[in-house]
């Protein structure tokens, strides 16, 4: 059941400011004052959209629930696939460590490699929505285009795998104020991350591991990539080496990786 959209306090304040600016102009306040306030407000909203972990534009899942923390669970999320050259290896490593993950997949990549998406589900992981095209201008899109990107991917994932995603992650984590009402209308939860390895830009597994493991704790949501991941000096996808060491470290710490849909 879809819930009625409730704007965040920031968006409510923004709407009030716009109304106040119009009222001020109507009673003769200087236009420059009203324009300055509106411009400053739009600057704040833009900055909020450029900050992936921001909650100013609406709900944004940064960590797992308290129950998941108490169960010593963490979530490994893997973005930008499926990639037939990388994803199968990632799945094998997860199997070897009896770990589960959530794969935020791009719709057009699922269309190109449906059998890889089906294998992700067959092995007990979840596939979540990462938009259809992973457009660089995603955060600049209007409501109709945003909705098309998301709905099309929901349909592709469902028709290909039989699984209906419950979570969405924006391309690069960027968004605008129009995204939150769309997600609520589709019963999707926005997810970002607690910490990321920057494995699309760094080819040194040790540096990536250090970023992921510093202050690592139960309830964390980690971000890695099977699509567009960097390659080591030996031309191996960096996520392969990172994931093996990360899962070994989690075991030593008594932490278990679960998919988002199975977290406590």
Show the residue positions of the predicted features.
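Active-site beta->alpha N-cap acidic-glycine motif
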Residues: 49-138, 152, 156, 256
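A cross-domain feature marking catalytic cores of carbohydrate-active enzymes
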Residues: 78-80, 105-107, 129-131, 169-172, ...
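Acidic-and-aromatic substrate-binding clefts and catalytic sites of carbohydrate-active enzymes
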Residues: 81-85, 105-113, 136-144, 169-177, ...
């Amino acid at each position: 059941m879809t819930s009625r959209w409730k704007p965040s306090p920031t968006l409510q304040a923004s709407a009030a400011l716009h109304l106040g600016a119009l009222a001020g102009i109507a009673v003769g306040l200087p236009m420059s004052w009203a324009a300055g306030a509106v411009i400053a407000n739009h600057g704040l909203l833009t900055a909020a959209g450029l900050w992936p972990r921001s909650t100013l534009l609406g709900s944004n899942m940064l960590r797992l629930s308290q129950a998941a923390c108490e169960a010593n669970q963490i979530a490994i999320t893997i973005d930008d696939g499926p990639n037939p050259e990388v994803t199968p290896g990632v799945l094998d490593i997860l199997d070897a460590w009896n770990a589960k993950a959530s794969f935020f997949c791009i719709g057009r990549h699922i269309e190109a490699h449906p059998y890889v998406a089906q294998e992700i589900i067959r092995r007990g992981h979840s596939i979540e929505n990462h938009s259809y095209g992973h457009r660089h201008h995603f955060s600049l899109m209007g409501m109709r285009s945003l909705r098309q990107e998301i709905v099309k991917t929901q349909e592709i994932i469902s028709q290909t795998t039989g699984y209906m995603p419950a979570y969405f992650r924006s391309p690069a984590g960027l968004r605008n104020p129009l995204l939150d009402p769309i997600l609520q209308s589709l019963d999707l939860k926005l997810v970002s991350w607690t910490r990321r390895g920057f494995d699309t830009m760094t080819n040194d597994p040790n540096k990536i591991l250090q970023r992921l493991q510093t202050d690592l704790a139960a309830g964390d949501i980690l971000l890695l990539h099977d699509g567009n991941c960097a390659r080591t000096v030996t031309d191996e996808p960096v996520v392969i080496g990172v994931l093996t060491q990360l899962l070994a470290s989690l075991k030593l710490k008594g932490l278990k990786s679960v998919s988002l849909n199975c977290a406590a």
